[in-house]
Amino acid sequence: MSTEKDYVVADIGLADFGRKEITIAETEMPGLMSCRAEFGDAKPLKGARITGSLHMTIQTAVLIETLVALGAEVRWASCNIFSTQDHAAAAIAAAGVPVFAIKGESLEDYWVYTDKIFQWADGGLSNMILDDGGDATMYILLGARAEAGEDVLSHPHSEEEEILFAQIKKRLAASPGWFTKQRDAIKGVTEETTTGVNRLYQLSQKGLLPFPAINVNDSVTKSKFDNKYGCKESLVDGIRRGTDVMMAGKVAVVCGYGDVGKGSAASLSGAGARVKVTEADPICALQAAMDGYEVVLLEDVVSSADIFITTTGNKDVIRIDHMREMKDMAIVGNIGHFDNEIEVAALRNLKWTNVKPQVDLIEFPKGNRIILLSEGRLLNLGNATGHPSFVMSASFTNQTLAQIELFTKPGQYENKVYILPKHLDEKVARLHLDKLGVKLTQLSEEQAAYIGVSPKGPFKSDHYRY
């Protein structure tokens, strides 16, 4: 472990390897490279101090270096204890960007690193947050509430909350008033994923959001591409790398049929699995049925299926009573943001056998075993390397544009949650067409007038559902 300088990575000697993979990824990320070309000279993020909490992968390295090329100072940590690619972290650290991320880091270290990404060498404060899941944002807001005298740290509901609250208390003792100062310095946050967006909307509805936020997740070029097509490729990759199990002919259950569930079902179906879906939402359930999937109750298939994947963003989707009834060597994994979709805490008193990193065999009293991937955390990042570079280019181009928007136009946004305007969503899509050899049909003036749009777009209303 390297800790001499302003970074913490597993092995700084991996930097050259990471740099080679970053170079390859850049050729697959036309949106980010176009941002560098368009905005590099103007440096619209000059003066921005961005705290980033997002999976420290090769693709994220390209995002980080894009933000730096646009003038920002950046400090970075991963938003998941298993998702870091150590060679990517090393390459970014070697390039001079403070990064604090190790694949397989402890929860204690995770929250220490989250604190470190707010601790600038000159004692200054962050003025922007780029978040994935909302942990960096919540860290500051919880600490500020504690400083205001609210009793928010007394009753943790999980092991992770115990560790988070302990870290907040350490910072409160070391730097009284710091959380409030840091909160007040933030110009805005851009949020990557469904779970973090839900947190922001809850804060906004209660009048507790202290700065503007852009919901990057619900940009069409994020949710309909990263969430769907990204999962379509990376889910099966993670299961294969973790288990070497052949999926053709197996029965797989996908819990949830939102965008992530749709991509996951397609991923497993494409690998030859016989896919069944569970859903609480009647609209999503109808979509699943009309896409050809049997929509079932988990209780009715728990003893017969081979693979179980959670995609919901909710908690306790697969519970201990479900896992007790699973067949021997059933595979259980999650591709939603947090680890509480599967009731992993209830498994801790059983016999665990670690097979290899992020693959555990858990034995129940009656003798049946399950294969748990990434301890219930994101298996596509824990057991594999996440989504491909091309689809992440679309997501991260949205992040870059959102950071520019909030940082350069602070007076135009209230303390609410916003979505990037349609013309920027279409711009992100355009930036990725040439790479695929796509040719767009040009509307005539008459055609455009007939449907009430400009020949140059936007081509759809804000309420259009893609």
From Swiss-Prot:
Record flagged with keyword NAD: yes
Residues the entry annotates as binding substrate: 57, 132, 192, 222, 226
Swiss-Prot/TrEMBL catalytic activity: S-adenosyl-L-homocysteine + H2O = L-homocysteine + adenosine
UniProt xrefs under InterPro entries: Adenosylhomocyst_ase-like_sf (IPR042172), Adenosylhomocysteinase-like (IPR000043), Ado_hCys_hydrolase_NAD-bd (IPR015878), NAD(P)-bd_dom_sf (IPR036291), S-Ado-L-homoCys_hydrolase_CS (IPR020082)
Cofactor(s) required, per the database record: NAD(+)
GO CC annotation: cytosol
Residues at which NAD(+) binds: 193-195, 227, 256-261, 279, 314, 335-337, 380
The entry's keywords: Cytoplasm, Hydrolase, NAD, One-carbon metabolism
GO molecular function, one term: adenosylhomocysteinase activity
Reported function: May play a key role in the regulation of the intracellular concentration of adenosylhomocysteine.
Protein family according to the UniProt entry: Belongs to the adenosylhomocysteinase family.
The protein's name in its UniProt record: Adenosylhomocysteinase
Protein species of origin: Rhizobium etli (strain CIAT 652)
